[in-house]
């Protein structure tokens, strides 16, 4: 009861709802009519009477049964105990032991095992409803409770017991429910399964459960009421309980201790307990007998009986049931348990349930306990009994009568109830009571079977156990079981009478059914006629009486419990009761575990033994086999030696015919000898032929025509093969024949035509020269020349001629094709499987278009095929294929077979045997990637190639074909190096890869084809790859390179195109289609298409000038022309590499112009949609922030699959592909550039930033890389039209945002590289300023370019690195911070940013922190190189980036790189992946991205630094460029950094911070904290984490001051990027918290959430601070809305108090970020003035923020407003208020104390934009470090920290808090709580750090005041 207090309440409710009807399933009646009140009163009275009567009956029964009077008393007490223990059954057990030990085996540990109650025998069961009740109570608890109670109070308790039992059944049901729900759930397994687990114990527990039979009966009733849903559990447990339930005869439902039941139960109990215990039944012997039966039956179904029979009604029903119990019970049990119970539930069952509830109310604790305990078991198994009980509607009256009359009737009633209960759920229902009427009605005997029906499986178990027990006890269990089925059908009405069964509950012992049935039946029959006649009336009466009885029983039981049972029950429910139960469980568990362990040990030992035996046997077997093998080998050797000895003689003596004759003779002589002779003859013939093969070969040589056909091998070979001799070795003359055939073929080829020869010379011979393989050179001669490689040996010259002719045709059609064939064949053997991969790689290398254009792809595949044999370094790779691959062969293959995989087919044909592998691989690639034109020629080649190669392994070819088809999708190149890229941006990746490969690896010449392709790809990811691809593919790539500057075939050839053409022809030979393909791939950006004819003509013109045109003839033959295509003194493969390096500037110019065009177009399209007001629609179109976040999390690698808009998806995909492919190529710059472009492109907001990064990055990287990047970038858009076009659109979108950036990017020096990279990314390096300035492009560019150029190298480089860092979060910061809107937004801000960047440089710690963040993003500062898309390169580039752009950044990056390099590599990759998603998301909100760049520029630096974690973030904040890149790159970088780099960022951050003086400790600790925080958040929510950083960044940006809006924009991107988002958070500091809060949404939705926050000053309203969708709006708003508007929007969105920061937004309006200025002044003042105060303010701000978010917000507004004017003048002004206000106000936005602090800190840096910008900047860099480490938002606060170490520390803390807050704010959308926790954690952690920072900053305040 106590354990199931809720159950008790439920019981009361049930009693209330008992109305007249009990909900069998619900257990809660709907009626609470006045009649019920009257009924309850009457029931209470009746219950008392009935209890007394029943107790007397039970006594009589007990005595009649021969039970001890003492036992009977104990029984009563036990009844009470059982009832009270009903839930736990331990009481029942205890009482049973003391009172009815004979009856109850319950006391034995079995019960405890089954049920917890056995664990502590004396304890009232009610306390243990969970444990014992669940197990025991199912069967015994209700019985026990009621039975024991009845025993204690034979008269009063019988009735009460019954009602209690029913109520307990309900209680158990409710308790069970409660148990299931809360407390009991832990015990559910033990409670339910213990009996089930303990079938054996079930027997021993039987008595206990029998004792609990009453309880079980009650439980059964409860089960029926509770619901059949419980039946399975209950049934299982019941089955387990079955035996035990049958035992508790004394614990009759009626409450009789089973005096009579004991008699019947004695058999059961005696058998169970081992002593003849008659169930004590106070009511009388008959009742007790019935009860015994009922209990026994209930032992199975006792759990259900109580449920089925609610208190009074249950008893009556039992009594009535006793009359008609057998039938009724059986019927109910079998079907009515389900059907009748349900159907009759409303009337009888519900009544019973109500009665039970009433009884529960009356019985109170006991009933409830028993209910709770019995519920589970009873519900399942006893429901049937319950129904049976109900079956006898007259049972109630009968029970009354019986109770009044005597124990027998009561027993009958109990039996009926038992039967009903059995019907309800238990198969062991005592339905087998002998009462004829009962049998007629219910055939209750069958109720036992009902268990089977109701709980088919469990009841079956129950039945078996119960039957067993009953057989043991001599009970009628079997009979009952058999009857169950019939009873249901017979007695639906009886089931309705369940209300009566209370008495029957105790009679639930099915065992009594048969044995006691006769006796019980007599009285039951006596009452049964009346019950049958008065059945309906009885039902009503029963309901009323049951309710009254329940009330009485409750009162009595309460009294009893209070007297003895109740206290026990209460105590039972105490903690210690549960402890005891748990101990019992544990004991059982330990015992079980011991058994399990023993068993397991036994099994293990057995297995060990078996294993040892098996090993031993295996060894023996091996020995035997070895012996056999040795014998066989010896015999074979002997045989061959004997044959060899004989052969010479045979050869001399006779010919083959003679040998045959000899064999025949020997055969004639002896059969065996004949066989042996035959074998020997065969062997001798083989040897003879083998020896004579030379002559055959010579013959073959003499007839080379025979060798033409692979089918027609040398005659000698054919003879050998045709002979019986299957054993043959390669004839000794085979090589000679092969050489001769090749030579003849070469001669023929030379004779065949000058054009063909020229081709061969240029491509094949050059390659051959490189490779030094004549055959290969010959193969190169023609596309099919390679066919001669392998086939040549067998084909002889004729085949060669045929092949040559075919090749000639093919070469004419596909010069590259024939070349490819030659290449492939040589490599077939060497490269094998890798060949395909290499080829694939190569094909993509030479033609990026391959990815986009199937035909080119095919060519690429063909080239890949060639590459495969040659690797990327065709020349260097495999000697044979190398020549062909390098020059015409590969080119031809690339051109012709690019679609048709000509190389594969031609090579296959030429290769014959060897080429089969190549051909397979190549051909599949051809099939997969071949498309259009090449296929036709390929078909031609296939004719011959297939002739020779197909015959070898057509299936393999098909497989390869399929494989390649699949492969291009997954991994375009077999190597898988570019596979992913091939799939997404096959064209770009492939071209880049191939070009790089060809350029780099051909030079290497040492790299195998697969390795070469990979290496070349790695070395020249962008331009190199493109050129390499061009070189590999000969003219094609050359064409690509040559015409990057020109558009269309009609356009004049630009110098670049000419150079590229020459280079490609030099490298690839005059394979014009291949060269055209390569050229087009290279020039894809320009959308220039040079067809093969144009390339040939142009090359002829060029060569006429330089070397004469063999191009014409070469073109004619397709490959054969020996063209002065080779550049003197330049190796074949290296020309393209060289050209790539040289072409960089040209390519950059082309990229720049082309990208600017793209930007213009993109702006119109994408900018309208996304960045401008279209941004709102764009954001609306994109899914929710959560969706974006989810997408980024779910599709970190597959941005395309997101819910993002198609363009966003494409952009993300493209950027991801570019990054990845570039990454794979290993060209740090190229890859970075290319990835950056796509990455940037992925995010409209990112583009500018990425553009900036690109620009810086590319400049950082070599021009060649830029060109490669551009080529790859453009190729991807151009190459794969669907995918690439999407990419292009994305790029345009990026360009739109990046266009502004791009133009500046283009204009700025970095822009050039940016354009190289920026093509995809948007603007190049300029993107820093431009990106941040996207909206403010005009402003941003001049400032940014000036800044970006100057600052970009410095800050700009930081920005560049920031941009480059797009892959690397840090990179973005670097670029973003420096060039971000500060310069753009405010020229002075740009200067200040520069100053700050310098200050940051001065504050190397801050920058290092940034750098570390960069490290996290690895090349945030140096991301230019990092950007190239190589994460590893990012590490490499990071230092470069520093060197390139940042004098201060260099050291920053150095430490950060050093510390974060490794982290960076991993983190960058993660970030890049994440960035792709972020970019996608940001692109969804391109306006946000673009807007963000503008608004973010000031903020961008902050964002940048935030992105890079404080050090670099701050410097970027100072320089305008910094703020910008964060916008565009920040999404990428932050995405990357947030995802994984965040960890590295944090770690790097800590490292970077450590360099910072004063803040280093704080930074490190904060960084660690933040790292953990971010890591956690990142793990939980990659995007959320990014948003957290973004928010922090917003705060930082706000704190940074100037450019807050811009930074916010950037931060919006950064919101995804984490780091960048932090600066935005800072900008949002005043209202940055809003930004932060917005950031979370932005984070998921767009990288620009924070940036929107910052913009929120400009963009805040659109941002809505908290909604990423708002963010897009805010971005457009930021551009369009005035700073005030933004400020207002921001404050509205995020914080009212932030509105004052919005006011600063006005100030910022000059800088495009009013908020930043306002924040900056306040922050700066706070920073300068309040280093110490900041600590105080932070702590106070935390407190105040927590308590006074709004007030603080206002304060921050005021202070910010105040500080706004001051900021320019005195950073040291008492912006304490502002900072505090900001800090406090911030928290409103951030909704976090810590965030508020961060805001406050952030505000300080923000307050120092004009005059103190430099100091603030330097401080900001440090602060940003802290922020990043701590939390994105906090870093900006500590931006001034360099000068103010204190401030920095405080700001770091604050920023950290802010970071936490942004996370929290963001997380509210996702996981808000974790962020809050982190914030709190950070707050606690950061306090000491803040103090340290204070000390440090106080020690170096001058630094804070940078110029």
Curated annotation (Swiss-Prot):
Any single biological process term in GO: chromatin organization
Annotated Pro residues bias: 1513-1529
Main localization (coarse): nucleus
One of the record's GO molecular function terms: DNA binding
PROSITE patterns cross-referenced by the UniProt entry: HSA, MYB_LIKE
UniProt feature, compositional bias: Polar residues: 261-270, 333-342, 355-372, 884-898, 942-952, 1116-1125, 1242-1266, 1296-1310, 1431-1444, 1453-1462, 1532-1545, 1554-1568, 1585-1594, 1640-1655, 1662-1672, 1681-1703, 1769-1782, 1824-1844
Protein name: Chromatin modification-related protein EAF1 B
């Amino acid at each position: 009861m106590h354990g199931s207090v809720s159950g008790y309440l439920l019981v009361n409710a049930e009693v209330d709802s008992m109305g007249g009807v009990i909900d069998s399933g619900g257990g809660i009646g709907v009626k609470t009519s006045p009649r019920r009140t009257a009924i309850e009163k009457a029931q209470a009275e009746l219950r008392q009477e009935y209890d007394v009567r029943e107790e007397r009956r039970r006594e009589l029964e007990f005595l009649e049964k021969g039970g001890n009077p003492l036992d009977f008393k104990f029984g009563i007490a036990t009844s009470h105990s059982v009832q009270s223990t009903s839930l736990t059954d331990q009481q029942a057990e205890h009482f049973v032991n003391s009172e009815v030990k004979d009856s109850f085996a319950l006391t034995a540990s079995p019960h405890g095992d089954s049920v917890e109650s056995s664990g502590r025998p004396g304890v009232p069961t009610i306390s243990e409803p969970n444990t014992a009740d669940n197990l025991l109570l199912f069967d015994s608890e209700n019985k026990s409770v009621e039975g024991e109670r009845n025993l204690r109070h034979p008269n009063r308790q019988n009735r009460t017991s019954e009602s209690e039992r029913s109520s307990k059944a309900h209680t158990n049901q409710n308790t069970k429910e409660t148990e299931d729900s809360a407390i009991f759930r832990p015990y559910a397994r033990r409670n339910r399964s213990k009996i089930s687990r303990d079938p054996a114990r079930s027997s021993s527990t039987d008595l206990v459960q029998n004792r609990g039979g009453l309880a079980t009966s009650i439980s059964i009733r409860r089960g029926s009421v509770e619901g059949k849903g419980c039946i399975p559990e209950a049934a299982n447990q019941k089955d387990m309980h079955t035996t035990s339930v049958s035992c508790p005869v004394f614990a009759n439902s009626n409450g009789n201790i089973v005096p009579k039941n004991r008699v019947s139960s004695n058999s059961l109990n005696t058998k169970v307990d081992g002593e003849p215990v008659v169930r004590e039944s106070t009511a009388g012997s008959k009742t007790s007998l019935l009860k015994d039966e009922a209990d026994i039956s209930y032992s199975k179904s006792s759990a259900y009986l109580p449920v089925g029979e609610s208190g009074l009604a249950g008893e009556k029903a039992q009594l009535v049931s006793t009359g008609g119990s057998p039938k009724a019970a059986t019927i109910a049990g079998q079907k009515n348990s389900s059907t009748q119970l349900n159907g009759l539930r409303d009337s009888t069952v519900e009544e019973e349930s109500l009665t039970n509830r009433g009884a529960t109310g009356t019985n109170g604790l006991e009933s409830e306990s028993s209910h709770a305990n019995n519920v589970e078991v009873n519900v399942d198994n006893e429901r049937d009994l319950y129904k049976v009980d109900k079956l006898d509607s007259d049972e109630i009256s009968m029970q009354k009568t019986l109770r009044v009359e005597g124990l027998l009737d009561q027993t009958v009633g109990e039996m009926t109830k038992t039967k009903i209960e059995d019907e309800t759920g238990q198969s062991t229902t005592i339905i087998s009571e002998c009462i004829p009427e009962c049998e007629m009605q219910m055939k209750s005997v069958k109720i036992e079977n009902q268990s089977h029906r109701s709980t088919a499986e469990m009841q079956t178990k129950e039945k078996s156990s119960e039957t067993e027990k009953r057989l043991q006890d001599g009970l009628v269990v079997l009979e009952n079981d058999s009857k169950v089925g019939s009873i249901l059908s017979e007695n639906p009405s009886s089931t309705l009478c369940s209300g009566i069964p209370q008495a029957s509950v105790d009679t639930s012992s099915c065992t009594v059914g048969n044995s006691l049935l006769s006796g019980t039946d007599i009285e039951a029959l006596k009452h049964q006629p009346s019950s049958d006649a008065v059945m309906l009336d009885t039902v009503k009466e029963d309901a009323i009486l049951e309710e009254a009885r329940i009330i009485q029983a409750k009162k009595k039981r309460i009294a009893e419990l209070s007297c003895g049972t109740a206290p026990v029950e209460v105590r039972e429910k105490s903690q210690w009761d549960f402890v005891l139960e748990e101990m019992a469980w544990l004991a059982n568990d330990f015992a079980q575990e011991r058994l399990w362990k023993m068993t397991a040990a036994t099994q293990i030992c057995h297995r060990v033994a078996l294993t040892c035996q098996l090993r031993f046997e295996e060894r023996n077997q091996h020995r035997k086999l070895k012996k056999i093998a040795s014998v066989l080998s010896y015999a074979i050797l002997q045989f061959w030696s004997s044959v060899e000895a004989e052969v010479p003689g045979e050869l001399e003596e006779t010919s083959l015919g003679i040998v045959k004759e000899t064999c025949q003779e020997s055969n004639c002589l002896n059969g065996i000898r004949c066989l042996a002779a035959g074998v020997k003859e065969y062997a001798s013939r083989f040897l003879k032929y083998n020896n004579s093969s030379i002559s055959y070969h010579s013959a073959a040589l003499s007839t080379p025509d025979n060798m033409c056909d692979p089918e027609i091998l040398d005659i000698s070979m054919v003879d050998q093969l045709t002979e019986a001799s299957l054993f043959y070795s390669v004839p000794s003359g085979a090589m000679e024949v092969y050489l001769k055939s090749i030579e003849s073929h070469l001669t023929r080829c030379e004779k065949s035509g000058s054009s063909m020869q020229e081709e061969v010379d240029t491509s094949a011979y050059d390659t051959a020269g490189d490779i030094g393989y004549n055959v290969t050179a010959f193969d190169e001669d023609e596309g099919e020349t390679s066919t001669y490689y392998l086939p040549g040996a067998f084909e002889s010259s004729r085949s060669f001629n045929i092949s040559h002719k075919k090749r000639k045709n093919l070469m004419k059609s596909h010069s590259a094709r024939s070349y490819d064939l030659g290449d492939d064949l040589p490599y077939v053997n060497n490269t094998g499987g890798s060949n395909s991969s290499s080829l694939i790689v190569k094909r993509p290398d030479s033609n990026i278009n391959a990815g986009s254009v199937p035909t080119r792809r095919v060519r690429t595949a063909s080239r890949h095929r060639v590459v495969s044999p040659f690797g990327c370094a065709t020349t260097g790779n495999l000697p044979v294929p190398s020549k062909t691959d390098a020059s015409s062969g590969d080119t031809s293959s690339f051109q012709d077979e690019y679609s048709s995989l000509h190389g594969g087919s031609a090579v296959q044909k030429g290769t014959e045997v060897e080429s089969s592998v190549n051909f397979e691989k190549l051909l599949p690639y051809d099939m997969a990637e071949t498309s259009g034109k090449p296929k036709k020629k390929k078909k031609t080649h296939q004719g011959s190639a297939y002739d020779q190669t197909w015959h070898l392994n057509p299936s393999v070819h098909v497989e390869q074909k399929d494989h390649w088809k699949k492969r291009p999708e997954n991994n375009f190149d077999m190597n898988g190096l570019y596979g992913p890229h091939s799939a997404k941006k096959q064209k770009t990746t492939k071209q880049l890869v191939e070009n790089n490969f060809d350029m780099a690896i051909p030079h290497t010449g040492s790299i195998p084809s697969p390795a070469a392709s990979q290496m070349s790809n790695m070395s020249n990811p962008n331009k190199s790859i493109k050129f390499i691809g061009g070189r590999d593919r000969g003219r094609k790539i050359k064409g690509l390179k040559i015409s990057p500057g020109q558009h269309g075939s009609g356009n004049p050839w630009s110098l670049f195109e000419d150079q590229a053409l020459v280079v490609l022809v030099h490298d690839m030979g005059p394979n014009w289609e291949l060269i055209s393909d390569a050229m087009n791939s290279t020039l894809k950006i320009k959308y220039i298409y040079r067809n093969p004819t144009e390339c040939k003509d142009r090359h002829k013109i060029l060569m006429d000038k330089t070397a004469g045109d063999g191009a014409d003839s070469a073109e004619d033959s397709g490959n054969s022309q020996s063209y002065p295509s080779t550049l003197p003194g330049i190796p074949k493969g290296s020309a393209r590499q060289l050209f790539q390096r040289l072409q960089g500037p040209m390519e950059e110019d082309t990229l720049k112009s082309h990208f600017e065009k793209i930007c213009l177009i993109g702006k119109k399209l994408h900018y309208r949609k996304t960045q401008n007001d279209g941004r709102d629609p764009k954001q609306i179109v994109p899914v929710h922030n959560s969706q974006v976040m989810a997408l980024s999390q779910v599709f970190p690698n597959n941005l395309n699959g997101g819910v993002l808009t198609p363009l966003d998806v494409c952009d993300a995909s493209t950027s991801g592909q570019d990054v990845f492919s570039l990454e794979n190529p290993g060209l740090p710059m190229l890859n970075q550039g290319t990835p950056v472009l796509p990455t940037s492109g992925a995010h409209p907001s990112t583009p500018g930033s990425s553009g900036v990064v690109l620009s810086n990055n590319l400049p950082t990287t070599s021009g060649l890389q830029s060109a490669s990047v551009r080529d790859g970038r453009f190729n991807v858009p151009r190459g794969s039209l669907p995918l690439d076009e999407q990419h292009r659109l994305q790029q345009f979108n990026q360009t739109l945002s990046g266009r502004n950036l791009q133009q500046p990017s283009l204009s700025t020096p970095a822009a050039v590289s940016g354009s190289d990279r920026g093509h995809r990314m948007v603007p190049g390096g300029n993107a820093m300023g431009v990106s941040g300035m996207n909206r403010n492009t005009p402003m941003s560019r001049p400032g940014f370019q000036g800044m970006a150029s100057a600052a970009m190298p410095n800050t700009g480089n930081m920005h560049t690195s920031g941009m480059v860092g797009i892959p690397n979060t840090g990179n973005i910061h670097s670029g973003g911070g420096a060039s971000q809107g500060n310069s753009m937004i405010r020229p002075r801000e740009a200067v200040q940013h520069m100053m700050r960047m310098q200050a940051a440089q001065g504050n190397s710690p801050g920058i290092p922190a940034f750098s570390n963040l960069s490290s996290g993003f690895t090349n945030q500062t140096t991301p230019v190189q990092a950007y190239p898309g190589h994460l590893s390169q990012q590490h490499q580039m990071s230092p470069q980036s520093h060197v390139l752009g940042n004098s201060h950044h260099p050291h920053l990056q150095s430490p950060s790189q050093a510390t974060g390099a490794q982290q960076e590599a991993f983190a960058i990759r993660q970030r890049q992946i994440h960035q792709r998603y972020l970019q996608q998301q940001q692109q969804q909100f391109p306006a946000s991205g673009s807007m963000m760049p503008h608004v973010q520029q000031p903020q961008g630096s902050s964002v940048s630094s935030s992105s890079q974690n404080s050090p670099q973030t701050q410097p970027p904040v100072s320089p305008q460029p910094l703020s910008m890149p964060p916008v565009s790159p920040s999404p990428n970088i932050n995405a990357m950094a947030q995802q994984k780099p965040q960890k590295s960022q944090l770690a790097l951050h800590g490292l970077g911070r450590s360099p910072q003086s004063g803040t280093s400790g704080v930074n490190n600790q904060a960084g660690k904290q933040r790292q953990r925080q971010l890591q956690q958040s990142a793990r939980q929510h990659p995007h959320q984490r990014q948003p957290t950083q973004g928010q922090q960044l917003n705060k930082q940006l706000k704190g940074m001051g100037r450019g807050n809006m811009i930074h916010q924009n950037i931060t919006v991107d950064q919101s995804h990027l984490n780091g960048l988002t932090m600066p935005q958070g800072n900008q949002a500091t005043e209202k940055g918290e809003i930004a932060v809060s917005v950031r979370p949404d932005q984070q998921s939705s767009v990288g620009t959430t924070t940036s929107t926050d910052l913009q929120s000053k400009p963009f805040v309203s659109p941002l809505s601070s908290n909604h990423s969708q708002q963010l897009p709006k805010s971005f457009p708003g930021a551009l369009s809305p005035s700073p005030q508007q933004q400020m207002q929007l921001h404050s509205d969105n995020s914080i009212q108090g932030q509105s004052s920061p919005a006011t600063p937004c006005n100030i910022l309006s000059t800088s495009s970020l009013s908020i930043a200025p306002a924040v900056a002044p306040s922050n700066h003042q706070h920073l300068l003035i309040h280093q110490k105060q900041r600590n105080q303010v932070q702590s106070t701000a935390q407190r105040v923020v927590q308590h006074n978010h709004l007030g603080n917000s206002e304060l921050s507004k005021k202070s910010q407003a105040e500080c706004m004017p001051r900021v320019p003048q005195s950073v040291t002004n008492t912006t304490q208020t502002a900072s505090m206000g900001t800090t406090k106000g911030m928290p409103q936005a951030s909704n976090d104390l810590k965030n508020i602090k961060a805001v406050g800190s952030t505000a300080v840096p923000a307050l120092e934009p004009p005059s103190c910008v430099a100091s603030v900047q330097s401080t900001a860099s440090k602060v940003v470090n802290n922020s990043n480490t701590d939390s994105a938002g906090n870093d900006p606060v500590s931006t001034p920290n360099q000068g103010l170490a204190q401030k920095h520390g405080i700001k770091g803390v604050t920023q950290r808090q802010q970071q936490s807050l942004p996370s929290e704010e963001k997380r509210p959308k996702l996981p808000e709580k974790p962020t809050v926790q982190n914030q709190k954690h950070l707050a606690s952690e950061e306090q000491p750090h803040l103090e340290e920072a204070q000390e440090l900053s106080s020690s170096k305040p001058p630094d804070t005041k940078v110029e």
